[in-house]
Structures are given as C-alpha cells and as structure tokens.
C-alpha cells in the first residue's frame, strides 16, 4: 500500500522546491523530451506559474529517494495555464467562484533514473518507480492535492490530459467533467474539471483500498519544513543537463 512505502511532501522550503523542479527536468526534458534541456542549464524545469503554485514531491520512506511530483496552481494566478490555450468551454466554470478553482499540472513519475543523477548518500538522490507501482504513486499524488485543495476551499481543478488518461482516472472512481475541446499540446489533450469532493466520495464507494487511502487524510502529505533538512538536500542531486540531453 502507498503509505507503507512512500510519502508525499509539500515543498514549502527552497530545498524541496528545487527537488521538485529537478524531478520535472528529468521527466519533461530527459525522459519525455517535452521541453528543451538547453533552456534549463541548471537542471531545473520551471515556468511562470510556479510562484502561484503549491508543489508536492513523492519520496520513498526508507531510502528518501524522490520519485515523483505534482503541483496545484492556486486561484490567485491571473490565468490558469489551460485558460491561455483557448480550448475551454465558456460554461466550464460557470457556477464556481474563482477562489474555488485550481489547476493540476506537472504530474511526474520517474521511470528511468541514470547513474549521473547521484552524488552523496543514496537517500538524497532521485529514484524511480517500478511499473507495477506507478498507479499507486499516482493515486498518492492525487490524494495529496485533493486533501490540500479541499482544505483551501478548492472544489474543482482544471487538468489538461489525454482522453485515455481521463478514462483511467474514471475507472478509479475519480470524477472528471469535460471542460472544452481537444487541443494540440504535447500531443492531443483535452481540458477537464476534476471534482475534488465528488471524487473522494465516488472513489471511496467504488474501491476499498481507495476508501482506506482517503480515510487516512492525516497521511496525505506533510510539509518539508517538518522534516530534517539533512534528509532533503537538492545539492546532492548531480544533474548534468548536457549529458542528460545526449
């Protein structure tokens, strides 16, 4: 079960925020090739929405290796990323106040770490997630942003995903509503609204393991400021962008 092996950390310190960006760099620039590594010479992928977002990192409990990430963009931003793409239906958020909206993005799960990523103790490096545990880690990330979002009064979040991924989430019992038309953004993707409160109820009713997971709300995440800084050291992640891109 997720909580036995992993934990989600809310990155509320410069150190863990740097790790969040390093995970994004590895997944978006190295693994998937979505972004140009040369644009991020420090090995940290970032954008203008980071200042208005809450970042989360998944790490292994025993080793301390960081293996995944997600962010929740808060409603204080002028425009959510999906709003800049011109793909939303005009009635997508008609009955919601702005402060009840967010956007989920930069969902990252590391699949293929390389030797050049490590320097110093292994517990301080980046790890990877076995294929058979990817869904488990995804659900752990979803729980973290769902619990945090509801605590902040956020009821729905935009997500820009493939229709196949939306169907996968639906099979888990998570509730998504189509919010517009497909758009070409790193491939064809569609905007959806993820209904936080409805998803907790639906997934809990559909799946016993998810019911137990959401019931352990206190374990959804903990703040990095509550963790010994010696176990979260971004300087221990030796990332050579030029080598990674080769």
Q: In which residue ranges do the predicted regions lie?
A:
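Acyl-donor binding region in acyl/amide transferases
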Residues: 76-193
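Short acidic (Asp/Glu) patches
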Residues: 38-44, 49-55, 80-93
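Short phosphate-engaging motifs
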Residues: 16, 165, 199
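Charge-patterned, long linear interaction tracts outside catalytic cores
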Residues: 234-246
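Accessory, usually C-terminal, subdomains that scaffold auxiliary metal cofactors
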Residues: 179-232
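Short, flexible loop/turn elements at secondary-structure junctions
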Residues: 12, 60-62, 74-76, 106-108, ...
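Short amphipathic alpha-helix that is part of the acyltransferase structural core
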Residues: 1-45, 55-62, 66, 71
């Amino acid at each position: 079960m997720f909580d036995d092996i992993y934990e989600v950390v809310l990155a509320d310190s410069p150190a863990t925020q740097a790790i969040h960006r390093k995970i994004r760099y590895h997944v978006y620039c190295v693994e998937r090739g979505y972004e140009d590594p040369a644009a991020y010479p420090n090995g940290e992928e970032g954008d203008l929405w980071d200042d208005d977002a809450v970042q989360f990192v998944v790490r292994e409990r025993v080793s301390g290796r960081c293996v995944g990430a997600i962010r929740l963009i808060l409603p204080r931003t002028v425009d959510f990323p999906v709003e800049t793409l011109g793909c939303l239906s005009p009635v997508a958020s008609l009955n919601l106040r702005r402060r009840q909206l967010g956007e989920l993005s930069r969902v990252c799960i590391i699949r293929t770490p390389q030797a050049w990523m490590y320097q110093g103790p292994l517990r301080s490096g980046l790890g990877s997630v076995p294929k058979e545990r990817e869904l488990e880690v995804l659900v752990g990330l979803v729980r973290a942003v769902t619990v945090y979002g509801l605590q902040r009064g956020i009821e729905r979040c935009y997500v820009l995903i493939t229709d196949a991924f939306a169907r996968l989430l639906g099979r888990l019992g998570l509730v998504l509503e189509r919010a517009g038309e497909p758009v070409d953004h790193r491939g064809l993707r569609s905007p959806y609204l993820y209904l936080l409160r409805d998803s907790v109820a639906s997934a809990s009713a559909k799946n016993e393991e998810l019911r137990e997971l959401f019931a352990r709300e206190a374990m959804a995440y903990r703040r990095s400021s509550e963790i010994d800084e010696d176990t979260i050291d971004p300087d221990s992640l030796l990332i050579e962008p030029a080598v990674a891109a080769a």
